């Protein structure tokens, strides 16, 4: 009975029941036992019903409404248990008739206050459980882990239905008020972290852009090699060009003194005259090579000899009977001699020379071979 008294919040001892029976109010006694049955059913269901806060902590979903559990009417065998127990206690006292007015049975005595209705306590519990669900609307890991700590304080509210002097609403409000600054601190921390991340992203993006610009600029502008500055071309006047051409016709190669005299006469530097002569010789050799090839193909070696006199002596009888192959060979020898430009021999040592290419028809000692030429050299005896 003492356990029942602590659970219901009102004294239901033998003395209290006897005093209630002695007052002569069977309806009051019936009401006390009905309230006792309701309290017992509420205790049993509150123990069997899981805590809404524990459901939030473990599952993370909305808890089941405790109102649907506590609003069910008490079972008939628990309600009728009160009069039977009262009958056994009073040793043969008859239970009150069932036709007693319900108003008298539900009115409590001024000395004994009945426990609060389980409906109002369940409504308070539902409102207390609904408050933390609406306070945090995000389902992030930080919010769930942060909500588990303050919501764990709501675990003892599952047994608060049996105790009338317990105030779960005030404790939940105090827990929420203590949890609000924590949420504000977490929000401020997350905002600061986001700002720092954005600033770091901007910095990294800026450095990346600068690096990309440097790479693109290095690709667009390749490394400049150390080149010597190109000299500007000299613009010669007509008078200077005419004098240089006349000098080149006389001499293809100039000595150092002749080059210095010509440069002083034309108001040019020694380097400018030297460069012009080099370019002019290259052009002349190219033109000469082309002309020799054309004349060799045509077979007109006499015109070639007139155009380019050779230091070698050729007899007219040999030139008349020369074919195109021999003329091409002679032109090649002449062209090579012009490139070499051998120095002029001493006048006393100079004598007419005949190239070996041109004496293939002559015998030893300058005598004609077995096949005489069409135009023999005058004064040469014919072979017999």
From Swiss-Prot:
Expressed in the ganglion cell layer of the retina in the eye and in the ventral zone of the dorsal thalamus of the CNS. Residues 229-288 bind DNA. The keyword Phosphoprotein does not apply. InterPro entries: HD, HD_metazoa, Homeobox_CS, Homeobox_TF, Homeodomain-like_sf. GO terms for molecular function: DNA-binding transcription activator activity, RNA polymerase II-specific; DNA-binding transcription factor activity; DNA-binding transcription factor activity, RNA polymerase II-specific; RNA polymerase II transcription regulatory region sequence-specific DNA binding; sequence-specific double-stranded DNA binding. Residues 1-134, 154-237, 364-384 are annotated as: Disordered. It holds the Pfam family Homeodomain. Its main location: nucleus. One of its GO terms (cellular component) is nucleus. CDD domains: homeodomain. GO terms for biological process: amacrine cell differentiation; cell fate commitment; cell fate determination; nervous system development; neuron differentiation; neuron migration; positive regulation of transcription by RNA polymerase II; positive regulation of translation. It is found in: Nucleus. SUPFAM superfamilies: Homeodomain-like (SSF46689). Transmembrane segments: none annotated. Residues 119-134 have a biased composition (Low complexity). It comes from the Eukaryota. Residues 177-217 have a biased composition (Basic and acidic residues). Keywords: Developmental protein, DNA-binding, Homeobox, Nucleus, Transcription, Transcription regulation. Belongs to the BAR homeobox family. Potential regulator of neural basic helix-loop-helix genes. It may down-regulate expression of ASCL1 and, within the thalamus, up-regulate NGN2, thereby regulating distinct patterns of neuronal differentiation. This is BarH-like 2 homeobox protein. It comes from Rattus norvegicus.
């Amino acid at each position: 009975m003492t356990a029942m008294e602590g659970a219901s919040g009102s004294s239901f001892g033998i003395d209290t029941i006897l005093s209630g029976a002695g007052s002569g109010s069977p309806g009051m006694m019936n009401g006390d036992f009905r309230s006792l049955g309701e309290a017992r059913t509420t205790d049993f269901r509150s123990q069997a019903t899981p805590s809404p806060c524990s459901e939030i902590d473990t599952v993370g979903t909305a808890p089941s409404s405790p109102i649907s559990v506590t609003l069910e009417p008490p079972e008939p065998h628990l309600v009728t248990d009160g009069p039977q127990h009262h009958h056994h206690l009073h040793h043969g006292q008859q239970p009150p008739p069932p036709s007693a007015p319900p108003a008298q049975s539900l009115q409590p005595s001024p000395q004994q206050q009945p426990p609060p209705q389980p409906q109002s306590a369940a409504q308070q519990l539902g409102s207390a459980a609904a408050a933390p669900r609406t306070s945090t609307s995000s389902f992030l890991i930080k919010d769930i882990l942060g909500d588990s700590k303050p919501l764990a304080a709501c675990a003892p509210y599952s047994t608060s239905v049996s105790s009338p002097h317990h105030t779960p609403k005030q404790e939940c409000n105090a827990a929420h008020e203590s949890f609000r600054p924590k949420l504000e601190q977490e929000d401020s921390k997350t905002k600061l972290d986001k700002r720092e991340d954005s600033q770091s992203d901007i910095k990294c993006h800026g450095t990346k852009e600068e690096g990309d610009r440097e790479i693109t600029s290095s690709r667009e502008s390749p490394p400049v090699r150390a080149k010597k500055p190109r000299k500007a071309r000299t613009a010669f006047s007509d008078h200077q060009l005419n004098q240089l051409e006349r000098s080149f016709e006389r001499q293809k190669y100039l000595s150092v003194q002749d080059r210095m005299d010509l440069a002083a006469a034309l108001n040019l530097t020694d380097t400018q005259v030297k460069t012009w002569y080099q370019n002019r010789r290259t052009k002349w050799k190219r033109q000469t090579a082309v002309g020799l090839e054309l004349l060799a193909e045509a077979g007109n070696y006499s015109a070639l000899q007139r155009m380019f006199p050779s230091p070698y002596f050729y007899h007219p009888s040999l030139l008349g009977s020369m074919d195109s192959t021999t003329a091409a060979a002679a032109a090649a020898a002449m062209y090579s001699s012009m490139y070499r430009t051998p120095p002029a021999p001493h006048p006393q040592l100079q004598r007419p020379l005949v190239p070996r290419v041109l004496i293939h028809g002559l015998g030893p000692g300058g005598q004609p071979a077995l096949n005489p030429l069409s135009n023999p050299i005058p004064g040469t005896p014919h072979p017999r």
